[in-house]
């Protein structure tokens, strides 16, 4: 996996986790508020938010460079299952 892709994926996960914390702690009232502050569309924020709940094994694979080379931020975020096992299966992470 290219270093730029790895960095983009990890940055997206970190942002998504931060946004969820903001909502949970009441620092932001909505995804629309976050989108305005981030100068992004609310749709993009809502697309990325599920990355906050990404399987720890997938995050570790991104960090150590063993994640599939065709993994992208948008591809990973799109229709992300809630189950960690299903997430891992979807991207082809071997057990």
For each feature predicted by the language model, list its residue ranges.
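Short alpha-helical "recognition helix" segments of helix-turn-helix
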Residues: 30-38, 45
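Helix-turn-helix/winged-helix DNA-binding modules
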Residues: 11, 26-27, 37
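Conserved phosphate/pyrophosphate-binding and hydrolysis machinery centered on Walker-type P-loop NTPases
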Residues: 9, 38, 66
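Short, Lys/Arg-enriched anionic-surface-contact patches
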Residues: 1-23
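C-terminal interaction appendages of subunits in large macromolecular complexes
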Residues: 4, 38-40, 48-52
């Amino acid at each position: 996996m290219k270093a730029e892709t790895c960095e983009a994926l990890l940055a997206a996960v970190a942002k998504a986790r931060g946004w969820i914390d903001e909502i949970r702690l009441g620092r932001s009232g909505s995804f629309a508020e976050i989108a305005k502050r981030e100068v992004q569309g609310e749709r993009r924020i809502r697309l990325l938010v599920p990355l906050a709940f990404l399987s720890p094994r997938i995050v570790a694979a991104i960090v150590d460079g063993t994640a599939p080379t065709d993994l992208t931020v948008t591809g990973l975020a799109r229709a992300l299952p809630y189950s960690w096992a299903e997430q891992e299966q979807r991207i082809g992470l071997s057990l």
